[in-house]
Amino acid sequence: MSIALVTGADGFIGSRLVELLVKKGYKIKALSQYNSFNNWGWIEDIECKDKVEVLTGDIRDPHYCKFITKNVDIIFHLAALIAIPYSYVAPDSYVDTNIKGTLNICQAAKEQGNIRVIHTSTSEVYGTAQYTPIDEEHPMQPQSPYSATKIAADA
């Protein structure tokens, strides 16, 4: 059985991905950002949570990233700070999580033996559409600190 690590599993899309991967037969390590309430976000509501190993931690910690990537076959990296308005108030937090956190996951995957990483992005990297439908050739136009950090993480 393949083991998948899902970062950002506590978010809406991450929790839906966890459910899908469980149905497809994956053993899941689901990363939820640590909080003092021990709340797992959207993972709390999934029907298959008893089949999921929930880990609480922070992708900003490179040592923790090395720890959670041990014995993993694939990583689905969805973890990110996403609140656009707050990115103007605390842009360094977005740099630390969205850029450095992504780098930590990628470096840990490489050090563990080149684990495949599937990284998610956002339509925010394209800014205001110059044409529709937007495709991957559309120019990137960051319009917030959030979208700028997602563009950097995509690179």
Residue ranges of predicted features:
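N-terminal Rossmann-like NAD(P)+-binding domain of SDR-like oxidoreductases, especially those catalyzing
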Residues: 1-155
